Amino acid sequence: MTRLSACLAVLLALAPLALAQSPADTVRAGQYDNGKMWTFDFPPLDYFEETYGLTLDDEWLTTARMGALRIPNCSASFVSPSGLVMTNHHCAREQITAVSRPGENLLDDGFYAQSMSEERPAPEMYAEQLIRIEDVTDEVLAALEATQTDAERADARTTAIDSITARIETAMGDAFTAEVIALYNGGRYSAYTFRRYDDVRLVMAPELQLGYYGGDADNFTYPRYALDMTFFRVYND
């Protein structure tokens, strides 16, 4: 008998014993074990109330949605009525470097505008605010009814989405962008309308050693002793 055959024989002999001694499977999957991120239009309100004792109404959800922002490769939040925006330090490093003047290294040294006139415009920086969510599922699926092949369905879907996007952006004006999002593996399509702010200025950024204190090892560790933040301000022309 070879060594491999001997090992297999031992494993087969021990398998029934291991199964007999194993306790019954007591693991039960929770309702949201696969993730706890939801769209603004379908939050699990009953779950929030039963689990956390938190009762949310439409006004609260609208305030949360209007306070959330999308910036290049990151998210951010409005934190004042005067357009002040807060995000993570790493989300702003490119902009911090871009507004540094000759002889300055604001990424390493930090920046603070003592008045609004000292805030520095960040080139190619923008912020987008989700102002409306529209269910366009019926419109997209209707465009697929006459299709027969996967290629035809893909083309029809793209055409329908482009048409919806163009219609919304034409109706809303230049300050707005639209994006159709496919959800639930194509079971639902939502048209998101964003208010876009292109005049974004740097207000405050700590020096890199404070903003990145602890590095990746400390990320998502609490309490965490770092000034992992940057402040911008958006201006509405």
Please tell me what each predicted stretch does:
Residues 1-2:
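N-terminal secretory signal peptides that target proteins for export/translocation
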Residues 5-16:
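Bacterial N-terminal signal peptides
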Residues 19-237:
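Terminal presequence/propeptide segments associated with secretion/organelle targeting
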